[in-house]
Amino acid sequence: KKLHRTRSNILNYEQLVKFTHKSQSVACQGCNNHCSLTINTFNDGTRLVAGNKCDKMVHRVETKKEELPDLYKIKTDMLNAQKKKFSHDKKIGMPLVLNNYDLLPFWTRFFDSLGYEIVWSTPSTKEMYHSGQQSIPSDTACFPAKVVHGHIQQLIDKGMDVIFYPCMTYNVDEHQSDNHYNCPLVAYYPEVIAANMDFDKTKIVYPFISFDDNATFAKAIRMHFEKVGIHFNEKDIIIAKNAAMNEYEAFH
């Protein structure tokens, strides 16, 4: 009565006799999440969708794919272009893993200023993971850390004389929080690599560095590269670091 209806919406006897119900499980194709949906179809053609986490299938909301940029592809293309930006005869290997994805523009520019080209490992594959699997010391590490072993093995197999993979307690300070720690695995996995892999004739350089202080950064880089027969001047290192930070900020 309050709704001013002349009759109830509850099914009457005749409708109940004719009532049928069909249930079907499908994977939603509305986006990459592919939610598991249960579609209930009734004899009058109406449907009830259950399991949905959004309204796309309920209200048939369609999003044109061309309106959604592929941000992953855009960033990957930018990183690939950055890799090819500098070229030198002298080369140093670096694994394209963990925080090195974000720091790729920094390190390519940094070593370019010092007269070296970075040879990056290729994108991760199942075969790459298997190639370094035997040297993984703990199954508790995350997969992105485990696959580092395959990236390092690839650089060794390429015959790189030197691999650079620094330990970094802190990431770049973006001044958006009280601190800027790296995940412990990101920060110190180079030590795990150095202790558990057979480098044959390849030498690995894994200093503890921080971007927060030019003097300590330059000293660490100079001292650790001297151990493998590469000599850098600390003033040149600081100049290269400043140029690299400008490159990093321009990229991001």
Where are these regions (language model features)?
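An N-terminal assembly and electron-transfer interface module characteristic of large anaerobic redox
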Residues: 1-252
